[in-house]
Amino acid sequence: MKLEEEKIIKEIPANHLRSLLAIGGKLKLTSKTLKFKPHAFNIGGKELTFNLKAIDEISASHVIGPRSNQIHVKLKGEDFRFVVWATQKNEFVDAVKRQIAQNK
């Protein structure tokens, strides 16, 4: 049986917020997953992979402050936050939502 290859749909620069740390890297949407890959020079950053079927909610928010343009990814019992460019935030969230709907 041949496994379906994941296709990259969209990739944007992002910072993964972990308490007081902001780990720089990239958010990548594929046909099956949402991935965060930190830059190689980041200390303490780790790669994250979320199966699209496991994502309970994804949303864009705007709060006041230096980490204002955020994408929130919610899974069962876990909440992940990423800071992205304001111009890319809504478009990326919409693309993830479309891909989640296609994977149901």
Predicted regions and their residues:
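Phosphoinositide-dependent membrane-docking surfaces
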Residues: L34, T49-V63
